[in-house]
């Protein structure tokens, strides 16, 4: 996969992209990273990339010329995903990360002002994505967050391919509780079932815990999850237990 970042602050990406999984993915030729400062593509002597909005209003708006000119240098095909980071976009999700992990080329357009000239949005962008109902100073941090979520799903990037399949959201539920040594710590013990060696019982316990944890922390996900009759019975028993105290 190749990822290009159009940004006014390419140095922001150095730390994140050169460590841990990102670094290994590049070393193993699974990922090619390129940052482009689109200020270099400004058309006047002052390297101006923003201007006041037509019609008045607060803040500055990114001009179209630098972004369009930078895109022309990237050899972007029709198959590439060009992502605009913006609060009005589609909320980012695990499902979106899975979809984007299959792309060969992704371009992130990272703004840093009040907004974008609408012509950038309508003529260059394939996906508008938001990280949530809040506003950040720029698109760089969301782009880095998305990159981490996407790249770890590329086959061969993680040492253990099973790892991401057990992650929260991979099957629509939150992850089950995890324990490691010691068996007892400050009077807190590991559930006996995890020490039993019975893998069927362990799997059943983990699924039950995923259902309960999701029910408590993300009821919106439970509403979307295709509950089996057995799942419904698990949750009903849990609710009855809560009422009994």
Curated annotation (Swiss-Prot):
Pfam family, one: tRNA_m1G_MT
This protein's UniProt keywords: Cytoplasm, Methyltransferase, S-adenosyl-L-methionine, Transferase, tRNA processing
InterPro entries per the UniProt record, alphabetical: Alpha/beta_knot_MTases (IPR029028), tRNA_m1G_MeTrfase_C_sf (IPR023148), tRNA_m1G_MeTrfase_TrmD (IPR002649), tRNA_m1G_MTases_N (IPR029026), tRNA_MeTrfase_TRMD/TRM10 (IPR016009)
Protein EC: 2.1.1.228
Compartment annotation: Cytoplasm
Record-level Gene Ontology MF annotations: tRNA (guanine(37)-N1)-methyltransferase activity
HAMAP family tied to this protein: TrmD
PANTHER family tied to this protein: TRNA (GUANINE-N(1)-)-METHYLTRANSFERASE
Designated name of the protein: tRNA (guanine-N(1)-)-methyltransferase
Species classification: Bacteria, Bacillati, Bacillota, Bacilli, Bacillales
């Amino acid at each position: 996969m190749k990822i290009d970042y159009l940004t006014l602050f390419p140095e922001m990406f150095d730390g994140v992209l050169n460590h841990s999984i990102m670094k290994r993915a590049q070393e193993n030729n699974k990922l090619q990273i390129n940052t482009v400062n689109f200020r270099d593509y400004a058309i006047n002597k002052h390297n101006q990339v923003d201007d006041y909005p037509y019609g008045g209003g607060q803040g500055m708006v990114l001009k179209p010329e630098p972004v369009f000119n930078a895109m022309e240098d990237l050899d972007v095909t029709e198959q590439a995903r060009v992502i605009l980071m913006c609060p009005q976009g589609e909320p980012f999700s695990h499902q979106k990360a899975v979809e984007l992990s299959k792309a060969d080329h992704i371009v992130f357009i990272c703004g840093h002002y009040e907004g974008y000239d609408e012509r950038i949005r309508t003529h260059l962008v394939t996906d508008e994505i938001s990280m949530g109902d809040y506003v950040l100073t720029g698109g760089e941090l969301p782009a880095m967050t998305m990159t981490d979520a996407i790249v770890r799903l590329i086959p061969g990037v993680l040492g253990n391919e099973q790892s991401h399949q057990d992650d929260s959201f991979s099957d629509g539920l939150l992850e089950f509780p995890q324990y490691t040594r010691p068996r007892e710590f400050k009077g807190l013990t590991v559930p006996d079932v995890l020490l039993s060696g019975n893998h069927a019982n362990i799997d059943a316990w983990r699924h039950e815990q995923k259902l309960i944890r999701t029910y408590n922390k993300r009821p919106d996900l439970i509403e979307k999850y295709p509950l089996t009759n057995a799942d419904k019975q698990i949750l009903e028993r849990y609710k009855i237990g809560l009422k009994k105290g």
